[in-house]
């Protein structure tokens, strides 16, 4: 593979049972541009225990001594609410001495562990890293910067440095619309209007006064509806369980979601029918396979019986007939002599005379 080939990749890391994990966690290793990478997270912060920290780590032995890579990368914390992912990213250089870069203050732990914020789902956190390695590898002595030169505060920080320099936060679709007290991104405005038109009493008993909480609940509702609109093939049983949890949360918050509960019950029934149908289909396929094997076995036995029947039907040749007749006569003669001897000398003499000897 050419060293000048630009390579990029996306890696997803799912942290199961987040609440029981140790403070420092490493992801499995993944490879980009011939180098081995992994993600490193500090659940209680690398330096500040109020924040969740995430870093991208390059295996030191992946690059020859005196060389370094220029990399553009981003790290995303998935959120169940649309357009609310936490994304930080930017360019930096990796070498043998500075092989870990990332974000000390990635996200407030208080916000991360709050279920209403949408980052933790069933005690599971999903982190996505996008790594873009630029084409050239440059010798370190050609790109060394003056140590006295200040660093741009909009660059990512190396984990070995004393200060934390945060990359720019990537935000998509910043335009928002206020619909009946719910502020949503413009791309979701039409969906919210349709929900409120068809179910005008959905938020009559909603007790949330905080604007951020109101927005989070509406985004939660939109995300739930989008999930339920997937095909049965895409929907897993785990998705349906999570939908149940989401409905309970919305109902407890004061949303009237009876109509959505009915839809979810219908989905569950259809999913059960699908699973039962797939089970029956699998059973029929297994039975059919056994019948096919039995058919092949019977076909083989049939051919064997046909061959044996043809052999049995074959007529005797003249030589076969003579040999068999002579053998039969000799057998009869020997039997008569043996019988005569056992009956006594007189009968034996008679049989001997009848044999032509006088």
From Swiss-Prot:
MATH domain span: 8-131
A Pfam family matched in the record: MATH_2
Keywords for this protein: Coiled coil
Segments forming a coiled coil: 250-309
SMART domains in alphabetical order: MATH (SM00061)
Parts of the chain that traverse the membrane: none
InterPro entries in the cross-refs: MATH-CC_domain_protein, MATH/TRAF_dom, TRAF-like
Listed name of the protein: MATH domain and coiled-coil domain-containing protein At3g58440
The organism of origin for this protein: Arabidopsis thaliana
Record lineage: Eukaryota, Viridiplantae, Streptophyta, Embryophyta, Tracheophyta
């Amino acid at each position: 593979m050419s060293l000048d080939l630009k390579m990029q990749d996306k890696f997803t890391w799912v942290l199961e049972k987040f609440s029981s994990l140790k403070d420092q966690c490493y992801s499995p290793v993944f490879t980009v541009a011939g180098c081995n990478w992994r993600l490193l997270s500090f659940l209680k912060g690398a330096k500040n225990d109020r924040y969740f920290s995430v870093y991208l780590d390059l295996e030191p032995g992946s690059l020859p001594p005196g060389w370094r890579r220029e990399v553009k990368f981003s790290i995303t914390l998935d959120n169940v609410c649309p357009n609310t992912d936490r994304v930080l990213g930017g360019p930096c250089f990796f070498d043998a001495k500075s092989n870990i870069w990332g974000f000390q203050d990635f996200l407030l732990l208080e916000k991360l562990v709050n279920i209403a914020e949408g980052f933790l789902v069933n005690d599971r956190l999903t982190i996505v890293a996008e790594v873009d390695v630029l084409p050239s590898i440059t010798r370190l002595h050609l790109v060394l910067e003056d140590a006295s030169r200040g660093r741009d505060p909009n660059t990512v920080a190396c984990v070995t440095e004393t200060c934390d320099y945060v990359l720019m936060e990537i935000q998509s679709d910043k335009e928002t619309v206020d619909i009946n007290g719910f502020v949503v991104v413009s791309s979701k405005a039409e969906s919210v209007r349709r929900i409120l038109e068809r179910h005008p009493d959905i938020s009559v008993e909603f007790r949330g006064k905080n604007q951020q909480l109101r927005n989070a609940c509406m985004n939660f509702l939109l995300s739930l509806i989008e999930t339920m609109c997937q095909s049965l093939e895409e929907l897993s049983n785990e998705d349906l369980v999570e939908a149940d949890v989401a409905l309970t949360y919305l109902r407890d918050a004061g949303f009237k979601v009876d109509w959505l509960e009915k839809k979810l019950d219908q989905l569950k029934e259809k999913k059960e029918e699908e699973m039962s149908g797939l089970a029956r289909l699998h059973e029929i396929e297994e039975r059919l396979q056994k019948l096919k094997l039995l058919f092949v076995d019977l076909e083989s036995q049939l051919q064997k019986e046909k061959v044996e029947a043809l052999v049995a039907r074959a007529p005797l040749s003249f030589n076969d007939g003579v040999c068999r007749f002579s053998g039969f006569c000799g057998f009869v003669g020997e039997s008569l002599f043996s019988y005569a001897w056992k009956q006594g000398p007189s009968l034996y003499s008679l049989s001997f005379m009848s044999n032509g000897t006088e």
